[in-house]
Amino acid sequence: MSKGFLVSLEGPEGAGKTSVLEALLPILEEKGVEVLTTREPGGVLIGEKIREVILDPSHTQMDAKTELLLYIASRRQHLVEKVLPALEAGKLVIMDRFIDSSVAYQGFGRGLDIEAIDWLNQFATDGLKPDLTLYFDIEVEEGLARIAANSDREVNRLDLEGLDLHKKVRQGYLSLLDKEGNRIVKIDASLPLEQVVETTNAVLFDGMGLAK
């Protein structure tokens, strides 16, 4: 790649994005692709501290706008400190969540103004958007059941939210898919992990213009 390529992974809770990413890394490395993987919120020291505040299960009184602004603050620091330098160095950057999460969770899920969220995303990223977004779709009940069955996963504040919020979040993602289908590719995350990885690999390499 002559320049960097930015990929974001999106989806409702329990979609398995992290597991897919872990399985993809050896494939990418075997192809000689220089890749940086990172996550939101977090990715850098300041971002990880903000992540702790956002996801702390005891912070049940957090206001929706406070939550949004914390995500935006983490996003800005993460981009400046880690993501942009990697893109400038010509690397493939894969982000576990990015701008679409704010629209889905705080816009559709929390009911905040989507235009305001779009403006904040634009402000924080200077207009940067992913070259490709992989949306891992799964029924809300199945995703939450996966989380409940995973004893190794630490429960966070969003896991404790009611079913209604998670359904709104999924609808938000599906709305984004309709609106930005040229950038966002839907992947059926209910399939066995091996099949999801195979599909993701094909979509990713096609998007990057590389042979599988």
Curated annotation (Swiss-Prot):
It catalyses: dTMP + ATP = dTDP + ADP. One of its GO terms (molecular function) is dTMP kinase activity. Keywords: ATP-binding, Kinase, Nucleotide biosynthesis, Nucleotide-binding, Transferase. PROSITE patterns: THYMIDYLATE_KINASE. GO terms for biological process: dTDP biosynthetic process; dTTP biosynthetic process; dUDP biosynthetic process. Phosphorylation of dTMP to form dTDP in both de novo and salvage pathways of dTTP synthesis. NCBIfam families: DTMP_kinase (TIGR00041). Belongs to the thymidylate kinase family. HAMAP family: Thymidylate_kinase (MF_00165). PANTHER family: THYMIDYLATE KINASE (PTHR10344), UMP-CMP KINASE 2, MITOCHONDRIAL (PTHR10344:SF4). This is Thymidylate kinase. It comes from Streptococcus pneumoniae (strain ATCC BAA-255 / R6).
